[in-house]
Amino acid sequence: MSAATAPERGWKSEKVDEAQALARSCAARRPDFQPCDGLSICATHSHGKCFKLHWCCHLGWCHCKYVYQPMTPVEQLPSTEIPAKPREPTNTIQISVSLTEHFLKFASVFQPPLPPDSPRYCMISDLFIDNYQVKCINGKMCYVQKQQAPHSQKMSPEEVSAHDALISKESDTPKLGHCSSPSGSEDSGINAIGAHYVESCDEDTEEGAELSSEEDYSPESSWEPDECTLLSPSQSDLEVIETMETTV
């Protein structure tokens, strides 16, 4: 064991000698450096005991370092008198108040915009102002005016006599069948001339149930006049004559 420790001691001594030589060369440039006696003395340096720069050899390396200075008691530290009240008035509070007032004056500008109004929904039928029916006449979709409720007002004698004369005149002319145009061909359902439409199309014949072709269409054809006033096709109620699904 002694043989194993002898080379180790020799290697350590060589390192220490090399470190000390480096430390001396370092200390030679600084007159305030003083060499330590060895590792043991460097290890025993404690706070408040060394007052100069020393070099220490630790594991073969040279460390030039400052050692701690003695601590000064707290009672001996210089102190500054703190006045109980500020000698000069400060404007900190006044500035804060003025800034707050200035902000509140223009606060409305920084407010977020009002939320938009919620969308208002309406029924499609509310967008229309008149009253028509949609009927399937002879396989075609037609706008037919709805019958208005009978007026409760009584007609004057002059109106009654004029109405009877009109009825007798109409009885002399040949009647047209329902759901047929005066020309004998099926109308497209929309009267381009502006005449009235027939309300009742309940009596369909086999001949009228057949779909008409475009050749039979007569733009000058019109339906038998009705006593109701003419309105535009909107706010329509759906009535299906024949087996057909339709929508307004």
UniProtKB/Swiss-Prot annotation:
GO biological process, one term: nervous system development
Keyword Calcium: no
Ranges annotated as biased composition (Acidic residues): 200-227
InterPro entries referenced in this protein's UniProt entry, alphabetically: UPF0524_fam
Disordered, as annotated region: 169-248
Protein name per Swiss-Prot or TrEMBL: UPF0524 protein C3orf70 homolog
Keywords: Neurogenesis
Function summary: May play a role in neuronal and neurobehavioral development.
Family, similarity comment: Belongs to the UPF0524 family.
